[in-house]
A protein has these predicted regions:
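An anionic, turn-rich surface loop/hairpin at beta-sheet edges
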Residues: 74-95
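Short structured motifs
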Residues: 61-63, 90-91
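Amphipathic/hydrophobic helical signal segments and adjacent flexible N-terminal regions
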Residues: 1-50, 57-59, 65-74, 80, ...
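Short, exposed beta-strand-loop hairpins at the edges of beta-sheets
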Residues: 104-112
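Short glycine/serine/proline-enriched coil/turn segments at secondary-structure junctions
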Residues: 32-33, 85-87, 111
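Small side chains
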Residues: 51, 92-96, 105
């Protein structure tokens, strides 16, 4: 097989590791009560590079890509959405690394807060 075919197969395999719903079990910036305020906090990575998330009153739609960070499967995403509490439009970016059964990473709100997070696949 050529390098490009192998790379494509490897990339597809990494995407499948993240596809699905991940329950947010910890965030550095906010307590779990806030994370689960409206719904249990989550990230959902779908097919075709799309996805969504919610924690507290913050909701967003994501564009994600599988990658590798320090030799570990990882995912990077940009997002747009809003704060349902006051209607503020929000955008941001983030990333996560697969550490065993958990996804650990950081979500950034452009010109605002950021938080480390840990999530487990449901």
């Amino acid at each position: 097989m050529t390098k490009s075919v192998l790379a494509k197969k490897e990339k597809t395999k990494r995407k499948n590791e993240f596809q699905g719903r991940w329950r947010i079990i910890w965030m550095a910036q906010w307590d779990q009560e806030y994370v689960d305020e409206e719904v249990e906090g989550y990230f959902k990575f779908g097919t075709g590079g799309n996805g969504d998330f919610q924690f507290g009153y913050v909701q967003g739609s994501m564009d994600h890509r599988a990658t590798v960070r320090e030799g570990k499967p990882a995912i990077e995403f940009s997002w747009e959405g809003g704060d349902a509490a006051d209607g503020t439009p929000l955008t941001g970016r983030g990333w996560g690394v697969l550490e065993g059964e958990e996804l650990t990473g950081i979500i950034h709100i452009h010109l605002g807060d950021e938080s480390e997070f840990t999530a487990r696949k449901e």
